[in-house]
Structures are given as structure tokens and as C-alpha cells.
Amino acid sequence: MNELDFCPKCSSKSLKWQENKKWSCTKCDFVLYHNCAAAVAVLVTHGDEILLTKRNQEPAKGKWDLAGGFTDPNESAEYTCVRELKEELNLDIDTKKLRYLMSFPNVYYYKGISYNTLDLFFEYQIEEKCEVVMEQSEISEIRWIKRNELSLEDIAFESQKRFFEKYL
């Protein structure tokens, strides 16, 4: 990973990527850790069906995805689920009904930068299908699909493919 070259402290072109986790300046004592970003993915279910969203932006535009996104500073994973489902699908959910399932590491490639993420997977079961209003800047289509009809080749991210391999 060599996206950064210049040290923000001394301005020399001396940053080196080390140990697959940090940039260190060879001229001064500056160190920048590239820690994992937390992200959530919510498996919205109704009976044996799963709600999938089709991505309307890169990375993986046109691939199927679970609703979710990055955790903002000072935000819990559960609140991230609430916020993302409201933003993307206009769904109001109760955090008491969220069920944590598992997590997987992932790499999110965006505008030439690789972001290491830790994707936290939750399940939210709904009693009745309701009208879903998708955020069209992020989502081009939504689809309810039976669990046994899911095709991993159509899933956007490796972490979600690994999740579905274990979950299904």
C-alpha cells in the first residue's frame, strides 16, 4: 500500500508502508496507523427470504449487497444498523430485535485507496413485508430472495460471500 508518500509532519517524501498496518517516516518520528474501519451489514429477513440491495455506486456497482455501511465516530454498531437502514431503505428498526451473527475482515477499495474493514453481520427479522423506499443514490434495486436461490457470484464483497457460506 503506497497511497501516501509525503510525511504530514516534516513534508519529506519519506513515508514507508510497514508491517501491513502503518506508515512510518524515515526522517522524523511520525507514524500513521491504518486501523480497520468498522462496518455493519444487516440481513433483513422475512421467513425464508432475504432482502438484498443492488449497489448503485462503486465499488462493486451493480452487485448485490446487504443494507449497511460504515460506523461513524462515537456510534455503536447497533446504532449504525438503525441509521443505515433508515438512510438506505427508510426502515425504522428496534435495536432490541437486532441479532449479532458474526464478523469478517474485508478490504474496501474506493477511489484508489484500500480500506481495511471489519464487517459486523446482524440479522433483523420482520413480521410483515413493508414498503421499502430505497435511497437511489446508493441503491438501484431491492429484491427479496429465497435463501436457497442466493448466488454468491452476484454478491458484492468477499466478506459477505464468506458470511453467506457460513450462514446458509
Q: Which functions belong to the PLM regions below?
A:
Residues 102-131:
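Active-site-adjacent beta-strand/loop module that shapes the phosphate/pyrophosphate-binding cleft
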Residues 45-87:
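Conserved Nudix-box catalytic region and its N-terminal flanking loop in Nudix hydrolases
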